[in-house]
Amino acid sequence: MAKKVEAYIKLQVAAGAANPSPPVGPALGQHGVNIMEFCKAFNARTDSVEKGLPTPVVITVYSDRSFTFITKTPPAAVLLKKAAGVKSGSGRPNTEKVGTVTDAQVQEIAETKAADMTGADIEAMKRSIAGTARSMGLVVEG
């Protein structure tokens, strides 16, 4: 018989840096999950990801207080800012450009995000990533 799902918890945690402090501790604590067990498992699973990148995670909590979790790829905006070498996007994206990304960088980000995106093909995903870049005030070259 399958376990009864009690809750789904969605968080963004820095890769390799999960610790019991907020936001992780309170979110898991209110469902009775072993916080340190999650932190150790999450940090082990995100070893291959660049340290510090915000990584979305969906935690499924069961009625017996056990849990499973799925890590996703970092948000496209974070990957675009890293590729362009800027700290933040533009406050006025249509008039004020803050950086540039090449078509090759957009392709690389689309391939990274392919597992989480629901695009028909890589070209559709590239267009989606390029749209995100433009809405952040980045110029897409190529």
From Swiss-Prot:
Keyword Transcription regulation: no
GO biological process: translation
UniProt keywords, alphabetically: Methylation, Ribonucleoprotein, Ribosomal protein, RNA-binding, rRNA-binding
Membrane spanning residue stretches: none
Gene3D superfamilies: Ribosomal protein L11, C-terminal domain, Ribosomal protein L11/L12, N-terminal domain
Pfam families in UniProt: Ribosomal_L11 (PF00298), Ribosomal_L11_N (PF03946)
GO cellular component: cytosolic large ribosomal subunit
Post-translational modification note: One or more lysine residues are methylated.
Record carries keyword Ribonucleoprotein: yes
PROSITE patterns: RIBOSOMAL_L11
GO molecular function annotations of the record: large ribosomal subunit rRNA binding; structural constituent of ribosome
UniProt-listed InterPro entries: Ribosomal_uL11 (IPR000911), Ribosomal_uL11_bac-typ (IPR006519), Ribosomal_uL11_C (IPR020783), Ribosomal_uL11_C_sf (IPR036769), Ribosomal_uL11_CS (IPR020785), Ribosomal_uL11_N (IPR020784), Ribosomal_uL11_N_sf (IPR036796)
Subunit architecture: Part of the ribosomal stalk of the 50S ribosomal subunit. Interacts with L10 and the large rRNA to form the base of the stalk. L10 forms an elongated spine to which L12 dimers bind in a sequential fashion forming a multimeric L10(L12)X complex.
Described purpose of this protein according to its UniProt entry: Forms part of the ribosomal stalk which helps the ribosome interact with GTP-bound translation factors.
Family according to the record: Belongs to the universal ribosomal protein uL11 family.
PANTHER family: 60S RIBOSOMAL PROTEIN L12 (PTHR11661), LARGE RIBOSOMAL SUBUNIT PROTEIN UL11M (PTHR11661:SF1)
Protein name stated in the entry: Large ribosomal subunit protein uL11
Gene it is expressed from: rplK
